[in-house]
């Protein structure tokens, strides 16, 4: 199959190129850009130099339809909301890595993103692509709203608890840390080397755009879930997310039962690994991979469950999960093109 990447010059688009280049069922990758049409992508990014000349093409829905079967949209907020309706009318499958189609209610999207929402019909036609929990829906979908990086780590960590109603749904606290690539490619003061090196900072306190996405999906599993406390931090590394999640148990449970339940739930999920007693994941253990590693513990003294969930924000949190969804949409093995081990050290 031939695939297109709109927004190929950002970190998410570049990661799509890296991973799709290794996919045995992808015969050609065509890259599109709104501002750099005609430029050789491998001149901008020498790591892409090799046998293929990655020349950027203009974004034109009719031309894209003539080129490819599936389009990955790795675009800034607002772009895919405008582009997706035209692509869908032309019969293309669309996997959107932006936040434009993740929030079901337009007024909620507009309140958090401070921009006009996509057409309601497009939003409602999109399937939220948290692969481990939406396989059947994804297999039948034409449009995938690929989850955000933080929500991926958080939701995979919380799903086994929320679905079983084992925790107080009104008192969920999420403390998350991310590498600087999560802030995107465009330079800013917050990601400037002199500001970030040997530093650790909280940002978008009580205002992170991924908050309503997390709450929406949690409420799909348990409508009694309240507003979550969600804190995000930047740490001086390039890749990786660690979400440490705290919740109060609402029934008697042992740590052994917790771990066994997590392991059972994710037994058929090739990219999710649940750690054994006394072990907790580190971001380096998933670096460059589509994996999510999870550790869970229960503190009898405080009656709190702690879940630690780590992913690579550019892979499982973006491009890798998008390709995982692409595989499911097309009836391929879920792991196709994503089998590589994490980079270590």
From Swiss-Prot:
A single cellular component GO annotation: cytoplasm
Record PROSITE patterns: ARGC
Enzymatic class: oxidoreductase
Active site: 149
Catalytic reaction annotation: N-acetyl-L-glutamate 5-semialdehyde + phosphate + NADP(+) = N-acetyl-L-glutamyl 5-phosphate + NADPH + H(+)
Key words of the record: Amino-acid biosynthesis, Arginine biosynthesis, Cytoplasm, NADP, Oxidoreductase
InterPro entries linked: AGPR_AS (IPR023013), AGPR_type-1 (IPR000706), NAD(P)-bd_dom_sf (IPR036291), NAGSA_dehydrogenase (IPR050085), Semialdehyde_DH_NAD-bd (IPR000534)
Metabolic or biological pathway, per its Swiss-Prot or TrEMBL entry: Amino-acid biosynthesis; L-arginine biosynthesis; N(2)-acetyl-L-ornithine from L-glutamate: step 3/4
A Gene Ontology BP annotation from the UniProt entry: L-arginine biosynthetic process
Locations listed in the record: Cytoplasm
Enzyme Commission code: 1.2.1.38
Gene3D superfamilies the UniProt entry points to: Dihydrodipicolinate Reductase, domain 2, NAD(P)-binding Rossmann-like Domain
Molecular function GO labels: N-acetyl-gamma-glutamyl-phosphate reductase activity; NAD binding; NADP+ binding
Family, per entry: Belongs to the NAGSA dehydrogenase family. Type 1 subfamily.
Family matches, as NCBIfam families: argC (TIGR01850)
Name of protein: N-acetyl-gamma-glutamyl-phosphate reductase
Lineage of the organism: Bacteria, Bacillati, Bacillota, Bacilli, Bacillales
């Amino acid at each position: 199959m031939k695939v297109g990447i709109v927004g190929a010059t950002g970190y998410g688009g570049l990661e799509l190129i890296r991973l799709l280049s290794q996919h045995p069922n992808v015969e050609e990758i065509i890259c599109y850009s709104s501002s750099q049409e005609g430029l050789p992508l491998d001149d901008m990014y020498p790591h892409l130099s090799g046998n293929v000349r990655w020349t950027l093409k203009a974004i034109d829905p009719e031309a894209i339809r003539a080129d490819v079967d599936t389009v990955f949209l790795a675009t800034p907020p607002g772009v895919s909301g405008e582009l997706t309706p035209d692509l869908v009318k032309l019969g293309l499958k669309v996997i959107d890595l932006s936040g434009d189609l993740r929030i079901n209610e337009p007024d909620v999207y507009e309140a958090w993103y401070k921009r006009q929402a996509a057409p309601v019909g497009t939003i409602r036609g999109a399937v939220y692509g948290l692969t481990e929990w939406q396989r059947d829906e994804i297999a039948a979908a034409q449009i995938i709203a690929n989850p955000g990086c933080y929500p991926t780590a958080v939701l995979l960590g919380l799903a086994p608890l929320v679905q079983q109603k084992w925790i107080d749904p009104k008192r969920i606290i999420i403390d998350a840390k991310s590498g600087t690539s999560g802030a995107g490619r465009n330079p800013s003061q917050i990601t400037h080397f002199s500001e970030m090196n040997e530093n650790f900072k909280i940002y978008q306190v009580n205002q992170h755009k991924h908050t309503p996405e997390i709450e929406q999906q949690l409420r799909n599993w348990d409508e009694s879930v309240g507003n979550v406390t969600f804190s995000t931090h930047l740490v001086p590394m390039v890749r990786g997310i660690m979400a440490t999640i705290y919740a109060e148990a609402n029934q008697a449970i042992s740590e052994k039962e917790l771990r066994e339940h997590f392991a059972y739930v994710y037994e058929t999920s090739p990219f999710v690994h649940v750690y054994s007693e006394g072990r907790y994941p580190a971001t380096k253990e998933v670096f460059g991979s589509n994996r999510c590693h999870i550790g869970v513990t229960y503190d009898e003294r405080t009656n709190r469950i702690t879940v630690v969930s780590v992913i690579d924000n550019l892979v499982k949190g973006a491009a890798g999960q998008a390709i995982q969804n692409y595989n499911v949409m097309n009836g391929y093995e879920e792991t196709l093109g994503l089998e590589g081990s994490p980079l270590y050290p």
